[in-house]
């Protein structure tokens, strides 16, 4: 079971996002979300906090930079040691113990498009970085990268 109730959602593939988001709200999670994910959650009336509101930094460069921020990566990479938690508190950083992240469809775009600019925009930077940070801190941070795994998350959270 996830110890902390803050989840970061940053997905390109929104398959079943409505169901898992509603489930997380019912389980008393606070959802933080980026760009298109935030727009989607707003459209389906799921309460959440835009990540740019939390970081106090708007998305820049046409959305190329959304999650690359110490308030996000600090919350993912911190352990529950007193030292880390003190530092988070001093910097007003929350713990993220659950991430729901999937990547831009780079390979599909390469197969379908001959336009270099279109292909380049599908090179995911922030998503890969979020995944790597969560993996580095695997003892604390749970990451879901495929909508198929939402059922596993539901089962895990329901059993606790």
Put a short name on every predicted segment.
Residues 151-158:
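Conserved small/polar residues in nucleotide/adenosyl-binding loops
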Residues 12, 104, 158:
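Flexible loop residues that form catalytic
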Residues 70, 76-79, 90-145:
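Divalent-metal (Mg2+/Mn2+/Ca2+)-assisted nucleotide/phosphate chemistry catalytic cores
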């Amino acid at each position: 079971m996830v110890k902390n109730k803050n989840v970061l959602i940053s997905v390109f593939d929104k398959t079943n996002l409505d169901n898992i988001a509603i489930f997380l709200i019912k389980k008393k999670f606070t959802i933080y979300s980026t760009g298109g994910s935030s727009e989607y959650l707003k459209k389906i009336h799921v309460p959440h906090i835009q990540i740019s509101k939390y970081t106090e930094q708007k998305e820049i460069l046409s959305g190329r930079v959304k999650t690359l921020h110490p308030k996000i990566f600090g919350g993912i990479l911190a352990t529950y040691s007193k030292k880390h938690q003190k530092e988070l508190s001093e910097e007003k950083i929350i713990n993220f113990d659950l991430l729901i992240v999937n990547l831009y469809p780079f390979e599909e775009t390469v197969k379908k498009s001959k336009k270099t600019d279109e292909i380049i925009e599908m090179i995911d930077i922030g998503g890969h970085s979020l995944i790597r940070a969560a993996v580095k801190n695997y003892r604390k941070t749970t990451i879901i990268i495929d909508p198929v795994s939402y059922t596993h998350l539901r089962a895990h959270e329901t059993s606790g």
